Design a protein with these regions (language model features):
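Catalytic cores of the polymerase beta-like nucleotidyltransferase superfamily
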Residues: 1-303
Length: 303
């Protein structure tokens, strides 16, 4: 990142024979392909968001001021600058100390401004917590909870991208327990109620203690942590018991939750714009996850 405008960056690339892609010049972003690496350059800028939760900048203007650029960002740990020529660190928001403390803190003294401007930052906070094993600072956490309803205004594709990263977070840096950590944070913030209200219905629904230690919702979270890092498998694990609340309400028991769950999961995945192949495979796994592999089920259970 620097004060160079996208036009200046692209002109420099043409002059030096460096391949580049315009990945969002309106937001100051240019992708550079150099010496086998891929780098993103972002121009220092200031953002203006619409009132009422537009979640996308209404206006972007370039700035030569690194401090303006720093305080428009989401978290202090994402607002640390290093001069690649001199090695000098510039840290306007105190991100280095938060990095040492493994803490996610909003750049603004009023975290509600950061979360309210773009509610996807709530999902990003959960993703960073799951990938890095960081904790969220209390004020930032409270602001995220207060702004969670704003996730309803975020595009399904943006929600899906962050959810996928949370589900596969332990594969990023090898930190165990990442998916559960991220999902539990989404539950604590009640963000899960907005992005997957059908799944949130499992909160507090107890199960037979001889088979299940957790309520339906947290059983699903733990199941994600216990399966290999495949997106299809982890989506299936997350949603495999999503039909239990509906089955319980309809029949007073949880039989048929696999079939009900497959239909409910399809609705969730279609709403989040997952590819048809992913929807097909995930719903097939959910529909058949009660299959009696050991042929030990009693006749009345099969009925």
């Amino acid at each position: 990142t620097s004060s160079m405008t996208p036009g200046e960056v692209m002109a420099m690339c043409r002059d030096k024979g460096i391949k580049y892609l315009d990945i969002g010049a309106a937001f100051g972003m240019v992708e550079l392909h150099y010496m086998g690496g891929v780098f993103q350059h972002t121009t220092f800028r200031r953002d203006t968001y619409p009132t009422g939760g537009g979640h996308r900048p209404r206006a972007v203007s370039y700035s030569g001021d690194i401090n303006e650029d720093a305080f428009r960002r989401d978290f202090t740990v994402n607002a640390i600058y290093k001069n690649i020529l001199t090695g000098r660190i510039t840290d306007p928001t105190g991100g280095m100390q938060d990095l040492k403390n493994r803490l996610l803190r909003a750049t603004s003294k009023d975290p509600a401004v950061i979360m309210g401007d773009d509610a996807l930052r709530i999902m990003r906070m959960a993703r960073f917590a799951s990938e890095l094993g960081f904790e969220a600072e209390r004020g930032t956490l409270e602001a995220a909870r207060a702004c969670a309803a704003g996730l309803a205004d975020i595009s399904p594709e943006r929600i899906r991208e962050e959810l996928d990263r949370i589900l596969l977070s332990d594969a990023k840096y090898g930190i165990p327990g990442g998916p559960y950590r991220g999902l539990e944070l989404l539950d604590e913030l009640r963000a899960i109620d907005v992005i997957m209200p059908e799944l949130a219905k499992g909160r507090g629904i107890a199960q037979k203690p001889q088979y299940h230690k957790y309520d339906v919702l947290h059983h699903c979270f733990h199941a994600v942590d216990c399966i290999e890092p495949s997106l299809t498998l982890r989506l299936a694990a997350l949603l495999h018991d999503v039909g239990k609340p509906a089955a319980l309400q309809a029949t007073g028991c949880m039989y048929t939750h696999d079939r009900l769950g497959a239909d409910i999961a399809r609705g969730i995945l279609e709403r989040l714009r997952y590819p048809s192949a992913v929807i097909r495979d995930v719903t097939a796994l959910i529909r058949n996850h009660m299959f009696d592999l050991r042929t030990e089920a009693k006749e009345n259970t099969i009925r």
